[in-house]
Amino acid sequence: MNAIPLEHGLALASVLFALGLVGLMVRRNILFVLMSLEVMMNAAALAFVVAGSRWGQPDGQVMFILVLSLAAAEASIGLAILLQLYRRFHTLDIDAASEMRG
């Protein structure tokens, strides 16, 4: 069975990371910002898996598990902030979060 070349896997991870970064910069809705962060984290995890597969080391898979647990924690905290923002201001606009300080 032929493996996917390292360049193809890293190119896909780079494209996914760039798409997540664009979504992070362009969108003002906090839900889309969280989704863009998830795409970026999954792109980094994909790069770890591809690199670990290339050199036959399980380190990439271990890093993937760590990134996956970090993404789960980030999603739960982000969704909790999203719920509080919506309950207080009835909007999901990320600029409304600056008004939460008072």
Swiss-Prot record:
Main location: membrane
Catalytic activity: a quinone + NADH + 5 H(+)(in) = a quinol + NAD(+) + 4 H(+)(out)
Membrane topology: Multi-pass membrane protein
Positions of transmembrane segments: 6-26, 30-50, 62-82
GO molecular function: NADH:ubiquinone reductase (non-electrogenic) activity; quinone binding
UniProt KW keywords: Cell inner membrane, Cell membrane, Membrane, NAD, Quinone, Translocase, Transmembrane, Transmembrane helix, Transport, Ubiquinone
NCBIfam families recorded: PRK05715.1-1, PRK05715.1-2
Function according to Swiss-Prot or TrEMBL: NDH-1 shuttles electrons from NADH, via FMN and iron-sulfur (Fe-S) centers, to quinones in the respiratory chain. The immediate electron acceptor for the enzyme in this species is believed to be ubiquinone. Couples the redox reaction to proton translocation (for every two electrons transferred, four hydrogen ions are translocated across the cytoplasmic membrane), and thus conserves the redox energy in a proton gradient.
UniProt-recorded name of the protein: NADH-quinone oxidoreductase subunit K
Origin species: Pseudomonas aeruginosa (strain ATCC 15692 / DSM 22644 / CIP 104116 / JCM 14847 / LMG 12228 / 1C / PRS 101 / PAO1)
